[in-house]
């Protein structure tokens, strides 16, 4: 059960509430991710969805995962394995791997969320909290020119709450209660800000998560996420903004269960020492200039992040061992971009050129104890591997939007030049054995072309094609094999994918609808597997293909008749077929995605009351392993075998007391009305079955 209480001094109005497209004028659009609204989505010649704060309130989202389930093509995995806490984020787009979200460019106000965008793009630490978010913008197609490098899974940008013109503030508290284990989790949120007469704007944002999940033990979460936003309007055309952001997260990680233990009690957890923690501090500065024809932006940022984990593994029925993995990362980048609108004959067009320089450093340690008796004190941790890596990357991109009557044609080209190195050392009981120093240089041209036909003021048809690129990460340059450090640059390679879309969108008369067919073609894709010593080993999965259909729909019934004012429908459905095109598993489904996923909901608001009901469903998934046989039957350790599909129902009601009670609102709901029990699996070092 989930309930929400908060007091609010001022409500921010949703920019798209009227669903009206303004008159087109000659003006440079500039940053695609700035001031996102329904109009920008409609003009984008690719699959794109924006979830606003109002929509998040309507669907009673209590987490980033809940928010992303509203987006067609996006599948969210429940907490599991080493991504088994609320500190991490596991999302997969169009059948791509979801563990720690490795194949999408995920941003917060345009700044990368991952530890290191090139060398360590995973989100085992996902420094973003729902309470600080104004909107979620998911660009699934036609975005690879502007953003990278990991963009085959699209671009996901979380926009934080804007600095208001007038002083405003609110506080809120969300409480989640797990009926199966009587566990309680709290999420306090604070927002206060305004703009002074001299044009200086300030805002303080805080969002936290405290308490326990739904497992019986070892699932405590403690998250603090704070941001100070400043902005100053220098002139009518020039503005600067400075954001300071700090995130700290601690999450205990219940282990995966064997099939036998899961049958006994799926909520049990017997590994009290497993946890993940991390912190991130980042600062970003942005200068913008916008006049009648020009839009210039300079963004620079610095990120300092740290993460560590302790993972206990049973070696036998009587002994265990401990693995620990502290890691440090530092990132600096500068990104100038200039757009200019111009007329070509009777048509409006826009040229954009942008550049990014990014420098990142990583320092990683992996240690392991000797074996010890179950529940005995942990023995001394000794080094197994160390890694000192770094990347210097230059990216330049150009695109040009040609408005030719009802046609909009945008060719573009991105060039990535990347130098990555990693000094990787193997140890035996803390004594250095050998060091390898692999390096890889990548120079990649990534072309794209998008075409849109404006059939009416409200309806358009689009198609696009582009090339996406994923550079080799630090842990893909070297590995531990037989106790020896070995370079893998001869056996592995960067990933490339050819991406295609065709679709249509409609916005107007209360209806917001999108339909997209997609196809992703990997010549070679990499996959993370485990060896007998539980080391993570990157190998070639080979050629894969991802194809499918996405549907999104939202409708305001007030446009039908006044009698239905306040009634709204929202839904999405995705069909995905992601299969191997080579190897022993040719034509078989890739691991951990559902061919079918759907979400449908109704919201009704009358006077001060609002009621929402929604259903989420997904079809079965597979965890086939990496042997010679595609395994569908459950293994004894719970890691392998099919995962049944499931559906859940949720209801929520809320009451707005109005301004006479200082904007107080109270809401309550049930997320899983029929108490449906479902599970997922994990194949990593703490793998097994995980109850949902």
Task: Describe the residue ranges of each PLM region.
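Short acidic/polar hinge/loop motifs at secondary-structure boundaries
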Residues: 111-140
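Transmembrane beta-barrel wall of Gram-negative outer-membrane proteins
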Residues: 182-254, 275-286, 340, 394
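Extracytoplasmic beta-strand/coil segments of soluble accessory domains associated
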Residues: 33, 40, 65, 69-112
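Membrane-embedded beta-barrel scaffold of Gram-negative outer-membrane proteins
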Residues: 173, 190, 286-313, 454, ...
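Face-selective signature of the C-terminal outer-membrane beta-barrel domain
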Residues: 233, 239-245, 277-427, 514, ...
